[in-house]
From Swiss-Prot:
Any GO CC annotation of this UniProt entry: plasma membrane
Keyword Membrane on entry: yes
Compartments in which it is found: Cell membrane
Protein name, entry field: CASP-like protein 5A1
InterPro entries: CASP_dom, CASPL-5
Cytoplasmic side: 1-41, 94-117, 178-180
Amino acid sequence: MMNVSRPAIHPVDALPVAPTAGAIDRPPVRMKDVQGMPGTTGGLILRLSQFVPALISVSVMVTTSDFRSATAFCCLVLAVSLQSLWSLSLFIIDAYALLVRRSLRNHSVVQCFTIGDGVTSTLTFAAASASAGITVLINDLGQCNVNHCTRFETATAMAFISWFAVSPSFILNFWSLATH
């Protein structure tokens, strides 16, 4: 049997290290923190760039009186609402992690972010594509004077921009899971 000292049996007091003169208290740089990952400044900016176009898209679409006339437009409102809630939630989580200097590199957290980004980006892309198709159809039929084609186009474009901003988050998180 080996004589091994356990901290629970023989506690050892750790003396605090005195800071050196002129040293700045910064958290150490972690090599695996790639900008755009959860808990980084780049991730915070990506979440904001996902949230703002999604919010604009849902706001523009809801202010039209006839968006309920096509299922694709209703689907767009639903998908972009989900995207804006998801992005806002993760923006708040990223901001909190940056304020308290916590890492969000936990495997379960990154897996949750990856699945959520994948689901919301797929829904947003599908709804934006369907809305673009209906908008083109309305334009080709020459019914833009009756409908709100400009608003439909704006909402669809903002949904595509939001989807485009989700893609780097999803790819970085998926890459992190694959290399873990």
